[in-house]
């Protein structure tokens, strides 16, 4: 749903490739846990945003706030870090300010309902926190690159 492109993507790819090549599981773990730590505040802000901005009637805001949010990292040809919300359908649609649901009393008929207050409930916290996450990841990459240079 949200994709953070770190400015040091080439550096991320190079460090990740080197870590795989030398097989240093300790440094890999350090890198991945640093990425998870860096994105944790953004995930928490997205949950708060869901609780505050999505419709409270029917408990939609609480159900979405309980959705699983995880950090995924790619180290192949397109390196990057992605924060993803899963566990419920229509999360992306809700982020665009809409929800699709059956009509009360006629479950066979579905409608698209606008929820303008919900627009950006996920992307806004991601965009707001992206700079801090990038900075933290680049610092971690520098630290790990130095450790790799000393060890190998």
Segments predicted by a language model, with ranges:
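Mid-chain, well-packed structural core segment of small domains
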Residues: 75-103
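Short, Lys/Arg-rich flexible segments
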Residues: 1-80, 104-152
């Amino acid at each position: 749903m949200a994709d953070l492109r770190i400015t040091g993507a080439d550096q991320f790819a190079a460090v990740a490739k080197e870590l795989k090549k030398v097989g240093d599981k300790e440094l890999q773990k350090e890198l991945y846990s640093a990425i998870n730590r860096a994105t944790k505040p953004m995930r928490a802000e997205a949950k708060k945003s869901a609780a505050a901005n999505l419709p409270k009637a029917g408990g939609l805001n609480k159900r979405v706030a309980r959705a699983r949010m995880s950090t995924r990292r790619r180290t192949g040809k397109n390196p990057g870090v992605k924060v993803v919300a899963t566990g419920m359908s229509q999360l992306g649609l809700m982020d665009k300010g809409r929800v699709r649901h059956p009509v009360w009393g006629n479950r066979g008929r579905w409608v698209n309902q606008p929820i303008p207050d919900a627009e950006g409930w996920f992307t806004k916290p991601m965009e707001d926190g992206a700079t801090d996450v990038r900075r933290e990841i680049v610092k971690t990459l520098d630290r790990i690159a130095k450790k790799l240079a000393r060890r190998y």
